[in-house]
Amino acid sequence: MPELPEVETTLRGLSPHLVGQRIHGVILRRPDLRWPIPEQIERLLPGATITNVRRRAKYLLIDTDAGGSALLHLGMSGSLRVLPGDTLPRAHDHVDISLQNGRVLRFNDPRRFGCLLWQSDIQAHELLAALGPEPLSEAFTGDYLHALAYGRRAPVKTFLMDQAVVVGVGNIYAAESLHCAGISPLREAGKVSLDRYRRLAAAVKDILSYAIRRGGTTLRDFISPDGAPGYFEQELTVYGREGEPCKQCGRVLKHAMIGQRATVWCGSCQR
């Protein structure tokens, strides 16, 4: 599933091609993705101008002058690309938003776990209202994590992946950040010290920022809007490396399921 760096990479690739463009038309090749596509998409988008494209957590928000915003999620396998308007659709190209400049924003989603929704007051949308802070914002600190973790017995990895705690830190980057900070993913969230949470918050920021610069992580499905893969996969220290040696100490990496997610860590470097 695309995580925050992949969605941010998509945003940065799309934004220059979309902001200021007038929408010519919308083609829906199916009426639903994960949820039904609301009728406002076909009714309100044609003729509207895109005023901004931004990200909240793993959602892309396309603001318009039509009194609302389109909310998109890439799901497990979705991708968004801006293409010449005469590009023939392929399998799983479910949505086309054609632009006045002759190009088309195309949403491809083989597994249909993505979504395309509409909201007049986008920050009030139920998918966004209860989200925690952005991990790259000033609000996300070790002190914040330590205070919120007080008394919690869930594993720290589960805590870090809770979208009400902090948004956009999925399985890949939670595992990598915990390894960087030297914290076992099995440790109870409420038993991690303030100093270690400060190291963890710094690790999350550093790793996400670096992953964005590297274009995200290509694991099976993610391709950036220009068709290029993400290169952070080449930098992974623990994720997907069960049974291999730790890059820091050489010990064999451990593997377990935590919160129904495959988790890899170093029993020597992470305590």
Curated annotation (Swiss-Prot):
Similarity remark: Belongs to the FPG family.
One GO-annotated biological process of the protein: base-excision repair
Native source species: Xanthomonas oryzae pv. oryzae (strain KACC10331 / KXO85)
HAMAP family referenced in this protein's UniProt entry, alphabetically: Fapy_DNA_glycosyl (MF_00103)
Catalytic activity: Hydrolysis of DNA containing ring-opened 7-methylguanine residues, releasing 2,6-diamino-4-hydroxy-5-(N-methyl)formamidopyrimidine; 2'-deoxyribonucleotide-(2'-deoxyribose 5'-phosphate)-2'-deoxyribonucleotide-DNA = a 3'-end 2'-deoxyribonucleotide-(2,3-dehydro-2,3-deoxyribose 5'-phosphate)-DNA + a 5'-end 5'-phospho-2'-deoxyribonucleoside-DNA + H(+)
Gene3D superfamilies per record: 1.10.8.50, MutM-like, N-terminal (3.20.190.10)
Protein name (record): Formamidopyrimidine-DNA glycosylase
Positions annotated as zinc finger (FPG-type): 237-271
Active site: P2 (schiff-base intermediate with dna), E3 (proton donor), K58 (proton donor), R261 (proton donor)
EC number(s) from the headed UniProt entry: 3.2.2.23, 4.2.99.18
Cofactor(s) required for function per UniProt: Zn(2+)
Function statement: Involved in base excision repair of DNA damaged by oxidation or by mutagenic agents. Acts as a DNA glycosylase that recognizes and removes damaged bases. Has a preference for oxidized purines, such as 7,8-dihydro-8-oxoguanine (8-oxoG). Has AP (apurinic/apyrimidinic) lyase activity and introduces nicks in the DNA strand. Cleaves the DNA backbone by beta-delta elimination to generate a single-strand break at the site of the removed base with both 3'- and 5'-phosphates.
Domain of life of the native organism: Bacteria
Pfam family, one: Fapy_DNA_glyco
InterPro entries assigned to the protein according to its UniProt record, in alphabetical order: DNA_glyclase/AP_lyase_DNA-bd, DNA_glyclase_Znf_dom_DNA_BS, Formamido-pyr_DNA_Glyclase, FPG_cat, MutM-like_N-ter, Ribosomal_uS13-like_H2TH, Znf_DNA_glyclase/AP_lyase, Znf_FPG/IleRS
Record keywords: DNA damage, DNA repair, DNA-binding, Glycosidase, Hydrolase, Lyase, Metal-binding, Multifunctional enzyme, Zinc, Zinc-finger
Keyword Lipid biosynthesis on entry: no
